[in-house]
């Protein structure tokens, strides 16, 4: 029951503005009221993680966006991963899969372009699962669950892991700066 908005200079990683709801209320005596959701609130990021999964394959030098996969559904262990529209778009390229936000496409990248350890290390390189170094109290590191194959599959499209808004801002800054890591 909260929202966050933030503006950042992508080249310097400087936070220009940040706000959210509920806002600080000095009359409310609970610890949550004293936390900054930009750094404290960890959440399942959903499809925003697809950007980083694709970037991991691109950075490894193995990504071929013209290769095709069958969208719709895929089985991973005992779970069925579905595209958001439940039917997919037939056989499409990985580039189209990114455009259509295909859960199946990003899931099939594991084993095809990346293995689970490479994905986890790449997510860590982008700062997920650790503190960013920002000078604000109560920063959450989030969590990266990669124990089971279905957890890895879900992580590719932002389910089953927890991240913070500041981690996403820092990761996007790294992309904008050609991989250079800056502290917000």
Model-derived segments and spans:
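Gly/Ser-rich catalytic serine loop of serine hydrolases
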Residues: 40-49
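Beta-lactam-recognizing serine transpeptidase/beta-lactamase-like catalytic domain environment
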Residues: 3-41, 55-184
């Amino acid at each position: 029951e909260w929202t966050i908005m933030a503006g950042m200079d992508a080249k310097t990683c400087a936070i220009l503005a940040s706000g959210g709801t509920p806002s600080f209320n000095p009359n409310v005596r609970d610890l949550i009221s004293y936390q900054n959701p930009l750094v404290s609130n960890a959440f399942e990021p959903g499809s925003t993680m697809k950007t980083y999964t694709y970037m991991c394959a691109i950075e490894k030098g193995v990504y071929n966006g013209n290769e095709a996969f069958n969208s719709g559904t895929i089985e991973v262990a005992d779970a069925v991963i579905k595209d958001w529209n439940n039917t997919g778009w037939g056989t499409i390229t990985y580039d189209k899969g990114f455009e259509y936000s295909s859960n199946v496409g990003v899931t099939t990248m594991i084993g095809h372009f990346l293995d689970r350890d490479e994905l986890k290390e790449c997510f860590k390189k982008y700062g997920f699962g650790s503190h960013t170094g920002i000078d604000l109290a109560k920063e959450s590191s989030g969590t990266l669950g990669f124990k089971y194959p279905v957890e890895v599959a879900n992580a590719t499209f932002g389910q089953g892991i927890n991240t913070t808004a500041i981690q996403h801002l820092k990761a996007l800054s790294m992309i904008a700066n050609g991989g250079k890591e800056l502290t917000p």
